[in-house]
């Protein structure tokens, strides 16, 4: 007798099948125990008679309850029932789903009928509470209008009150915006934001003069007004193009002389008008953008220039002044005045802008 060994593939397949069979048998035995337990609980809780008959894969018979006499008695009574009684309380999955669907449809129909009934009831209530005026007589209609007029007037008054409240709520917003804009304008026009500067020709320095908001509008402008009135009483001078005039005031004989200063007559001799032996001379230059270098005893003017390069010939003149330094009062704006005690200085009258 020869014994052959099976191939490895067959051995693997047999081992896998045996393992799956063992797992299935284990799962079946566990489930069988669960079924027997549920049948016992059902009989106890519902007070009924139940039995379980089980045939295994190998033909083994198992029952619950374990007593075979009880199982045979229950099975015999069940077999004597007709088909209708047998299926009276038996439910399959298909039957269960159909019953649930039928129940849902019945509930929907009941809700629809309930809603219809509710609508009809509300309609009847509205008809009884608010009857229609189609069948009213003219007297009844007029009475109805008179009864409604007070309610209408109350509603209109309420509407007016609500609108007035809305306007009151919106007005403060506009007022706050207006006040903020006014404050911004006053801050932008605040005089404290301005400054005055003074230029010192002696050492060529520029110094700032503090200007406060209290005296900016009063002290400064009042002094400026008094000075302008005083100067307007002394002399008036008009400038047109390159035509300029120099006014010389002689306090000795209280006379006022006017010297035309233009590009055509700048080379004329005007030194005789500057000579004064009786008193202090006051020279006032009226105009704008003029520079003047003055001498104490003897001075000479070398040239008189204009912005458009109108140069005059050199004029050498000497003037004797026995009373010292002459006060100079410039009238107008953007003027610079330089005085010196050194002899033989030059007089320079320049019509260029000094910024």
From Swiss-Prot:
Pfam families: SRF-TF (PF00319). Residues 162-174 have a biased composition (Basic and acidic residues). Residues 176-186 have a biased composition (Polar residues). It is found in: Nucleus. Keywords: DNA-binding, Nucleus, Transcription, Transcription regulation. PROSITE patterns: MADS_BOX_2 (PS50066). SUPFAM superfamilies: SRF-like. It comes from the Eukaryota. Its main location: nucleus. GO terms for cellular component: nucleus. Residues 1-22, 162-186 are annotated as: Disordered. GO terms for biological process: positive regulation of transcription by RNA polymerase II. Residues 26-68 form the MADS-box domain. GO terms for molecular function: cis-regulatory region sequence-specific DNA binding; DNA-binding transcription factor activity; DNA-binding transcription factor activity, RNA polymerase II-specific; protein dimerization activity. Interacts with MEE14/CBP1. Probable transcription factor that may function in the maintenance of the proper function of the central cell in pollen tube attraction. This is Agamous-like MADS-box protein AGL81. It comes from Arabidopsis thaliana (Mouse-ear cress).
